[in-house]
Amino acid sequence: MSSSQQIAKNARKAGNILKTISNEGRSDILYKIHDALKANAHAIEEANKIDLAVAKETGLADSLLKRLDLFKGDKFEVMLQGIKDVAELEDPVGKVKMARELDDGLTLYQVTAPVGVLLVIFESRPEVIANITALSIKSGNAAILKGGKESVNTFREMAKIVNDTIAQFQSETGVPVGSVQLIETRQDVSDLLDQDEYIDLVVPRGSNALVRKIKDTTKIPVLGHADGICSIYLDEDADLIKAKRISLDAKTNYPAGCNAMETLLINPKFSKWWEVLENLTLEGGVTIHATKDLKTAYFDKLNELGKLTEAIQCKTVDADEEQDFDKEFLSLDLAAKFVTSTESAIQHINTHSSRHTDAIVTENKANAEKFMKGVDSSGVYWNASTRFADGFRYGFGAEVGISTSKIHARGPVGLDGLVSYQYQIRGDGQVASDYLGAGGNKAFVHKDLDIKTVTL
């Protein structure tokens, strides 16, 4: 048996045990993992500093450096809080979603159940190990994790803490060793992608190239998105203050995020639209990749107002219309163009977006509703920043990733996206041959029951 097959088999074995553990046991180990990571914050930070130093020496892109830095701002604290938030969420396993009486003493239930074994592959985001550990254990799934080489030292340190904690408290919580396994080599990943007998779902978190490569090389279902090309449309009835604040936040709050705005669509009838572009550059340092008609109108208006500065001119460049509207910049750059209507904005987004998250800024409810129904993305917002597309902000505690698929899970994937369901029938000796359709003459009752009153 190959090492990858053994890893996958061990995960399946652990998952079969984990799904039978009580919610109390699964939540308890998460609190203990939280405490252990917090207690070892210094060791984790030192490991992270090593990764950052190596990354800078090798010329890692700024967007990836920002993702790699686990102690930038409150990222580490948010990660820890996410573990506690997941622990405190309602148990996603064993929830009755449907109950139907088939006959007297014969009842059908649709009950949530873990997916099984997750293979999660991520690049330069060391906090993912904590997020996935929390979500997988809480949802009764075993997880195999592969971090990027950029975060290898942070990854190892955190993995050791997580696994030592699970082992230390196995007899107390019931959560088995093997519930979370860590792998390091690309060969392990390639081999594991062939283990469709044991692995139920692959979750890639990283670059477009990573996600597409995985989708092309495995039979295992893949949950994820390939790009984060998020657009904001400024309608003719947009509020200027809202437009400026939302656009600035969506682009500059965290440019390397997959939920950052990459495209700004502007209705030319929107009063003082140029102030939004001006604000993005002067307040946010954003470079505007503008279409020729937009750039001309922008410069003409600022020149008329005596506000066309050298800084504005340097930070406004010609858009490559063949590429820029299909591009995830992950930097302080965005593509901008005029669109003449809500319908035109919808058409542009559905043609160029990655179906991640898109927003409209308007005070016109009819236009907002048209936009939200017409845009084919996992998240569609009205008068809110695309940066809200996040499991933590949705109250999911954390997220496995963001799915742009329309099947199973869509948008930020939290606990609910990591459970499937099974059908359970609870009877009293009934056999199918007694009923119509199988040789008998008994009819089914097919009476739906109120799931709020059902106790299994």
UniProtKB/Swiss-Prot annotation:
The pathway noted for it is: Amino-acid biosynthesis; L-proline biosynthesis; L-glutamate 5-semialdehyde from L-glutamate: step 2/2
Supply the alphabetized keyword list: Acetylation, Amino-acid biosynthesis, NADP, Oxidoreductase, Proline biosynthesis
Q: Decide whether keyword Phosphoprotein is in the record.
A: no
Q: Name one GO cellular component term.
A: cytosol
Listed under catalytic activity are: L-glutamate 5-semialdehyde + phosphate + NADP(+) = L-glutamyl 5-phosphate + NADPH + H(+)
Gene3D superfamilies from the xrefs? Aldehyde Dehydrogenase, Chain A, domain 1, Aldehyde Dehydrogenase, Chain A, domain 2
Family, similarity comment: Belongs to the gamma-glutamyl phosphate reductase family.
Q: What HAMAP family would the database entry show?
A: ProA (MF_00412)
Protein name, per record: Gamma-glutamyl phosphate reductase
Organism (species): Saccharomyces cerevisiae (strain ATCC 204508 / S288c)
User: What gene is this protein translated from?
Assistant: PRO2
